[in-house]
């Protein structure tokens, strides 16, 4: 069974949050879904290799690109080759594409996310939210917490993020 079927994906905006596989999940969903798909972000994301990147505030350009490619990536260029949210409102993109899949959380490539109070950046228009956690987090109980959990706790407690104030513990399996 396809992942998009297991998630009961519906047309419209879907936010993907968490850590350890969000970007990979976006790519898989784009491949599996029938219909037009826009991959984008409400935070930061790297462009997808092999998927056309569109930077525009012209909805007609978006429609033409979707007619040619079926799957596109959209965003606004930012530092370090990353993209931020697209210039067009997400609701406008949802009118142009069957699916708009939004990476709505950052985790700095760590396998587990402890969100701060203002995270994740889930759009009010999102019809569904998919939470992701990397399975690698289950095997790292012996490593310092700060080395595998994105530090949302730091900003909530105003204390340095250390293992002593880490409230997330991976199960110990041998």
Where are the language model's segments positioned?
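Solvent-exposed alpha-helices and their adjacent loops that cap or buttress functional pockets
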Residues: 6-10, 63-67, 92-94, 120-124
């Amino acid at each position: 069974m396809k992942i998009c079927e297991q998630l009961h994906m519906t047309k419209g905006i879907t936010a993907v949050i968490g850590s350890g596989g969000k970007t990979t999940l976006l790519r898989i969903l784009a491949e599996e879904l029938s219909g037009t798909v826009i991959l984008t972000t409400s935070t930061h994301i790297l462009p997808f290799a092999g998927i056309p990147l569109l930077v525009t505030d012209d909805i007609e350009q978006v429609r033409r690109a979707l007619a040619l490619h079926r799957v596109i990536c959209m965003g606004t260029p930012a530092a370090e080759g990353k993209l931020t949210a697209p210039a067009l409102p997400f609701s406008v993109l949802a009118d142009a594409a069957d699916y708009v899949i939004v990476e709505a959380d950052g985790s700095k490539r760590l396998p587990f996310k402890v969100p701060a109070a203002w995270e994740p950046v889930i759009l009010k228009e999102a019809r569904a939210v998919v939470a992701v956690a990397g399975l690698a987090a289950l095997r790292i109980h012996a490593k310092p917490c700060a080395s595998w959990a994105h530090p949302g706790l730091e900003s909530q407690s105003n204390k340095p993020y250390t293992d002593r104030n880490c409230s997330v513990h991976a199960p110990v399996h041998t």
